[in-house]
A protein has these predicted regions:
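C-terminal accessory/regulatory regions appended to core domains
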Residues: 1-85
Length: 85
């Protein structure tokens, strides 16, 4: 598996902190849209690099996609929590 740069990991930590601190559904929706946009962009990059034969870069993008998919799950969990309140 390819490594992910420290800057990206720090961004993911900050992003996940935002999810956990979010106190309303409207703000959570903004976070969700940013996450989905990032996921879409990374997947497009993955497809492009993979089709061009840059498998190391493609693997890196796929690894980053996995982080954003995990964040999607956290967003869903936070939404469930906020809906119950």
């Amino acid at each position: 598996m390819s490594s992910v740069d420290n800057e990206f990991l720090m961004e993911m930590m900050d992003f996940n902190d935002e999810v956990e601190m979010c106190e309303d559904l409207a703000s959570l929706q903004i976070i969700r849209e940013a996450n989905e946009s990032g996921l879409s962009n990374l997947f497009e990059e993955f497809e492009r690099y993979f089709s061009e034969g840059y498998t190391d870069i493609a693997a890196n993008r796929l690894t980053k996609c996995k982080f954003l998919l995990q964040t999607r799950e956290r967003i869903d969990q936070r939404e469930d929590f906020l809906t119950v309140l």
